[in-house]
C-alpha cells in the first residue's frame, strides 16, 4: 500500500493526538440538580455545555440516557457543520423533567406523567434532528403511533351515523346491499385524512405545550414553519401514542386516541 502523503499523515496524527487528549480530559463530578427549564443548545458545542452542567461521573449515580451524549459517539473535538449564520446554531430545548411531566399530565390527563417510563417519556419527544440523533429519537415510535391513529380514525368513521343521503341512481338500479358492507360507503364522504389534518394536530400540540418540551433543532430558528415544525409536532404526538402502545398495550393506546385526540378534533 502506498505510503501516506505528508499532508494526510499530519492530519491523521493530529486527529490521533486530539482523540488522546479528549480521552484523558477529566470529567466534572456534580450531583444531579435542578437544571434550567430551557437552555441554548447547538448541535455540538452547546450540547457539551449541557452535559457539563448536569453530568455525573461514572462512580456516582448513573446519568439518565436522555441527558447526555455517549462518549463513543462524540467526534474528535471539531465539527464539519459549517453554518452561514451563527445565530442559527442556537436553539432552546427543555431539560426540566417537571416541565415534561406537566405536559404529559395536561395531554393525557391526571397521572399521565406516570404512564410511561422516564427514558421513554424523553425518547417520545426527541426528534432525530436533536444532537444528530445521538441520544435516540422517536421515528419508529411515530410510525407505530401513526398506524394506531389511522386505524382508530377509520373505525370512528365506520361507526358514525350516516349524515348523507344515498345517491339516487338515474337509471333506477339498486346496488347490492349486505350487513357487512353497510358502513363502507361512509368512507366515500369522509376520509381519515379529513379528520387527522396535520395542521389541526399541530395546533392541538401547541395548545398543550408540546412545542416547549419537544427536543429538536430547526434548520431556520427564525422561521419554524419553513423548518417543518408542523411535521415534527405531528410525528411527536404519534410517537407518544406509539410509546403508550409499546409499554401499556394496544387497548390503552386506542382508548387514548379516542378520548384525547379524536374527541378533541371533533370526530
Curated annotation (Swiss-Prot):
GO terms for biological process: mitochondrial translation; RNA processing. Gene3D superfamilies: Ribonuclease III domain. One of its GO terms (molecular function) is structural constituent of ribosome. Residues 43-73 are annotated as: Disordered. Pfam families: Ribonucleas_3_3. It is found in: Mitochondrion. The keyword Transferase does not apply. Keywords: Mitochondrion. The keyword Transcription regulation does not apply. InterPro entries: Ribosomal_mL57, RNase_III_dom, RNase_III_sf. One of its GO terms (cellular component) is mitochondrial large ribosomal subunit. It comes from the Eukaryota. SUPFAM superfamilies: RNase III domain-like. Residues 43-54 have a biased composition (Low complexity). Component of the mitochondrial large ribosomal subunit (mt-LSU). Mature N.crassa 74S mitochondrial ribosomes consist of a small (37S) and a large (54S) subunit. The 37S small subunit contains a 16S ribosomal RNA (16S mt-rRNA) and 32 different proteins. The 54S large subunit contains a 23S rRNA (23S mt-rRNA) and 42 different proteins. mL57 forms a heterodimer with mL44 and stabilizes rRNA expansion segments 1/2 at a membrane-facing protuberance close to the point of attachment of the ribosome to the translocon in the membrane. Component of the mitochondrial ribosome (mitoribosome), a dedicated translation machinery responsible for the synthesis of mitochondrial genome-encoded proteins, including at least some of the essential transmembrane subunits of the mitochondrial respiratory chain. The mitoribosomes are attached to the mitochondrial inner membrane and translation products are cotranslationally integrated into the membrane. Belongs to the ribonuclease III family. Mitochondrion-specific ribosomal protein mL57 subfamily. This is Large ribosomal subunit protein mL57. It comes from Neurospora crassa (strain ATCC 24698 / 74-OR23-1A / CBS 708.71 / DSM 1257 / FGSC 987).
Amino acid at each position: 500500500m502506498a505510503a501516506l502523503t505528508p499532508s494526510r499523515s499530519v492530519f491523521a496524527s493530529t486527529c490521533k493526538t486530539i482523540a488522546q487528549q479528549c480521552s484523558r480530559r477529566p470529567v466534572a463530578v456534580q450531583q444531579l440538580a435542578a437544571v434550567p427549564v430551557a437552555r441554548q443548545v447547538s448541535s455540538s458545542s452547546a450540547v457539551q455545555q449541557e452535559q457539563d452542567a448536569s453530568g455525573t461521573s461514572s462512580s456516582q449515580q448513573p446519568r439518565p440516557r436522555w441527558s447526555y451524549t455517549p462518549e463513543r459517539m462524540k467526534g474528535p473535538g471539531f465539527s464539519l457543520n459549517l453554518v452561514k449564520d451563527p445565530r442559527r446554531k442556537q436553539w432552546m430545548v427543555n431539560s426540566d423533567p417537571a416541565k415534561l411531566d406537566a405536559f404529559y399530565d395536561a395531554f393525557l390527563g391526571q397521572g399521565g406523567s406516570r404512564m410511561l417510563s422516564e427514558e421513554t417519556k424523553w425518547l417520545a419527544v426527541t426528534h432525530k434532528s436533536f444532537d444528530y440523533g445521538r441520544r435516540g429519537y422517536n421515528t419508529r415510535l411515530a410510525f407505530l403511533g401513526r398506524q394506531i391513529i389511522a386505524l382508530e380514525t377509520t373505525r370512528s368513521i365506520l361507526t358514525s351515523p350516516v349524515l348523507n343521503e344515498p345517491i339516487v341512481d338515474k337509471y333506477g338500479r339498486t346496488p347490492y346491499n349486505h350487513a357487512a358492507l353497510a358502513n363502507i360507503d361512509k368512507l366515500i364522504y369522509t376520509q381519515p385524512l379529513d379528520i387527522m389534518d396535520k395542521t389541526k394536530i399541530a395546533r392541538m400540540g401547541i395548545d398543550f405545550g408540546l412545542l416547549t418540551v419537544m427536543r429538536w433543532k430547526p434548520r431556520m430558528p427564525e422561521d419554524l414553519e419553513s423548518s417543518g415544525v408542523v411535521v415534527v409536532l405531528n410525528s411527536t404526538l404519534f410517537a407518544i401514542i406509539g410509546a403508550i402502545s409499546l409499554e401499556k398495550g394496544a387497548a390503552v393506546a386506542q382508548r387514548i386516541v379516542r378520548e384525547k385526540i379524536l374527541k378533541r378534533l371533533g370526530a
